[in-house]
Amino acid sequence: MLEQRNPAEALTVSVLNSQSQVTNKPLRDSVKQALRNYLSQLDGQDVNDLYELVLAEVEHPMLDMIMQYTRGNQTRAATMLGINRGTLRKKLKKYGMG
């Protein structure tokens, strides 16, 4: 579950720890762990387009949630994301969302 209590706080992910307690940790920690796992599985192989891979993993669900939150209002969604509406439309099309 992703949450942001106020704009000044980092996005957090709720995680169930080994003692069955739910804790919140910054989203960036989860991204780091996912990348660490991915890179450890490469076994020395080269990888291309890692930036695009990571961006797509984050950007697609972010766009989906923002569009749900704004009830499909692209102008409001673009404002929330800090991008212009044309850029938002391109990104929605890229992920088959618009």
From Swiss-Prot:
Assembly, per entry: Homodimer.
Keyword Metal-binding recorded: no
Species name: Histophilus somni (strain 2336) (Haemophilus somnus)
Keywords: Activator, DNA-binding, Transcription, Transcription regulation
DNA-binding region(s), chain positions: 74-93
Name of the featured protein: DNA-binding protein Fis
Xref: NCBIfam families: PRK00430.1 (NF001659)
Protein function: Activates ribosomal RNA transcription. Plays a direct role in upstream activation of rRNA promoters.
